[in-house]
Amino acid sequence: MEEQSKNKISEEEKQLHGRPNRPKGGLITMPFIFANEICEKLAVVGFHANMISYLTTQLHLPLTKAANTLTNFAGTSSLTPLLGAFIADSFAGRFWTITFASIIYQIGMTLLTISAIIPTLRPPPCKGEEVCVVADTAQLSILYVALLLGALGSGGIRPCVVAFGADQFDESDPNQTTKTWNYFNWYYFCMGAAVLLAVTVLVWIQDNVGWGLGLGIPTVAMFLSVIAFVGGFQLYRHLVPAGSPFTRLIQVGVAAFRKRKLRMVSDPSLLYFNDEIDAPISLGGKLTHTKHMSFLDKAAIVTEEDNLKPGQIPNHWRLSTVHRVEELKSVIRMGPIGASGILLITAYAQQGTFSLQQAKTMNRHLTNSFQIPAGSMSVFTTVAMLTTIIFYDRVFVKVARKFTGLERGITFLHRMGIGFVISIIATLVAGFVEVKRKSVAIEHGLLDKPHTIVPISFLWLIPQYGLHGVAEAFMSIGHLEFFYDQAPESMRSTATALFWMAISIGNYVSTLLVTLVHKFSAKPDGSNWLPDNNLNRGRLEYFYWLITVLQAVNLVYYLWCAKIYTYKPVQVHHSKEDSSPVKEELQLSNRSLVDE
């Protein structure tokens, strides 16, 4: 029955692509995927990294309105990946979702680029000290449509592109599974390299050459990303969508609730198994029964009311297979680990706000004639991240492998844990650097001169920026690996969307934390930890150390979650040259961060 199911899936793939099915995927597809990622990230980051300047200097929007416009866009862009993941996992597949989403994004970028080139689509430039004319309704409509198309495009690209790349390695082939974790490292490396190029070269072009060229280059890069991605079509592994994963999860919950009064069977083998029904959603292996959350197992208890007949597909709202029950268990188990990464994003977010404000008050001259822009300080984070990824992949893994015996060196839970520790050190160091900066300001009588440069080198900030980059190389990639590896096979786009959603929540938590600290640290004399106008009179170091304490508490929470976490147990089917599948049980259920 199981072999027939696999043959059926192969036939579906033949019909889907219109030609005989042959081995696809693997390393040969990586140049297309990485070229797509570099061009796409160069386009997206180059398009938005300096957008606040475009809105204020070209469209003459007030700063608050411009900031709120971009914030609303960012919030929408963080929600649409759930929609894109649903479409990809349910019926469209990842390839077509990425392709059409990229085209939608391309249209939005082209629209805004045209508005930057044609003078009538922008308000007239300001002359001298006169009041600038703000963009009218028609001109703003172009902006809003472009940003909306960008948000919709992001929704299809973000959750699918990284999962699609990982799909190119066959999990049932031991020779390819070891390449999957390597893929995540190099995917993030390509992304970081593109970001580095965007925040330096493209931002400089936008500020010093012109917005037509500054937005035109990212638009062309986006077009090239689509060409590069589509160019590998015949080489890719195209996994057939298996229907809405959300519907299956809800069906398990409803079936378990309906049978909540039943007594649990003593022998798990008496539960409902059906390899033929589960074949489309378990190509990489079947999830086996676990003892945790046994109340959900009641959804797989067969009763007379189910009226189950041989060869008949059951009503899934009343009866679910064990594999589908374990899908829901996997999603629930992932929640606490996934949520633990939110505070790291909160800490990382301070680089673009308060750390940047610190940099503005410090001496940033490399030579008498060249000064590093405060907004380019993130370059040190990106360089540290890229360097760490290379070191991790080429040195760290080989050394760790000798001690752990694991092909990937350490598990993704280990990797996330290391990232948490480094992030704690980064915010701790940031607090001490602020103490040093203010001591120099006091020494030179500059406490009440917020716009005067404090005679202290910006090099003092490099450790905190660099440590955040190292932390991201460990935590963010480990986080992404965790979501992809531990998510049910048919929900990997959705799982990647959850990764982006965690990043979004981390930024929102940062906003909430800043608001609360600003409110409750205010004193009658007007002093505040986070003052509006004079950082020298604030207590920014206290804010950094507050984040340090919160991260330390979060680390304890993470270690507890990792200790009790149960890896999803998969029964993999190897069907190389042998007509009968060889089943290999992956004993992962007792592995944890602490045990390993």
From Swiss-Prot:
Bias (Basic and acidic residues) ranges: 1-16
Bilayer-spanning residue ranges: 27-47, 73-93, 98-118, 137-157, 185-205, 213-233, 334-354, 372-392, 416-436, 453-473, 497-517, 542-562
SUPFAM superfamilies on file: MFS general substrate transporter
Major localization class: membrane
Region (Disordered): 1-23
Tissue: Expressed in shoots, stems, leaves, flowers and siliques.
Effects seen without this gene: Slower growth and delayed bolting. Nitrite accumulation in leaves.
One term under GO cellular component: intracellular vesicle
Subcellular localization, as worded in the UniProt entry: Membrane
Family membership: Belongs to the major facilitator superfamily. Proton-dependent oligopeptide transporter (POT/PTR) (TC 2.A.17) family.
Function recorded in the entry: May act as an efflux-type nitrite transporter. Not regulated by the PII protein involved in the regulation of nitrite uptake into higher plant chloroplasts.
Protein name per Swiss-Prot or TrEMBL: Protein NRT1/ PTR FAMILY 3.1
Native organism: Arabidopsis thaliana (Mouse-ear cress)
Gene of this entry: NPF3.1
